[in-house]
Amino acid sequence: MGIDIAKDTFVACFGRIEASQHLRFGKQASFTNTAAGFEELLTWTARQQAEAAPCWFVVEATGVYYEELAYFLADNAQELSVLLPNKVKHFAQSTEQKSKTDQLDARLLCRLGLERVLPAWQPPTPALRQLRALARERQSVTQQGARLKIRRHAYQHSYQPDSRTLERLSVQQQLLLTQLQAIDQDLADLLQTEPELARKLAHLTSVPGIGLTTAITVVAETTGFALVGSERQLASYVGLDVVQHQSGLSAGAPRISRRGNVRLRTALYLPAVSSLRHNPQQIAFYARLCSRHPSGKPGVIAVMRKLLLLCYSLWKQDHPYDPHYHPAHQVRKEIAPVA
């Protein structure tokens, strides 16, 4: 069952694969993106099944609009896969589909589920959901505070600023600061009640340049890297993958796609700059890049990508950062020949 989700509605497409390996697509239906629509989906799905065989739902992670349906299906013991948009896009490019509608997208997701072996979706823990909500709230409040600071500074240096306006701007700044402190306290309380989460976050903060706020943002925005299966997929999800456009004699310079999670790219920039002052490995890596590319900006972006993939590795392997580790220096275990 492929499901294309929008803000208010979603379209479902039923399909099956026959013994001859031919794909057969059945009916499509549209439902409201509400609890009532979810119940109607299960009833409609049961009518489409010719036999009592399990149905696998394939959903694209479209913003936050898919979450209610995904949790509903999981709570009702339904098997489903939640796919990152870039994975669905790459599959669509491999097909001959040129048009794009909700119905065609639902059919495409159905076809993807029939042709590929997809990982089952595991709902994020309540702690990770709360961590993501608090991390996003903190980033939003921080950005509001930065804009308000610039606005107050500009108004203060204008001709004859109104003292009452300056006072109101100061009150707004203090309010945002109070909210930021409350969010930080909520984060501290959460980590105190979730020692396992706090322990794994400590692995990330052991990297020079990665602070607790950055570590929280990375883990929260990837929901503990649950939807990521490889370093390449992670870089693409964040928009730090390298793309190049070349045709004939026209060849553009390689650049990052920037078609990913902007929150993560924003969160990784300052840590990358900081690591170029305190992390010897990143300093050496940056120097090698600058020897080939004099412009410093691509080097900083490469350090951002390296820090992101390092966080992924430390989280998955569940161990802290080792500045002396290098894969080339590891002793290979040889298998003794059988006598």
Mark where each language-model region is:
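A detector of single, family-specific signature residues
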Residues: 1-339
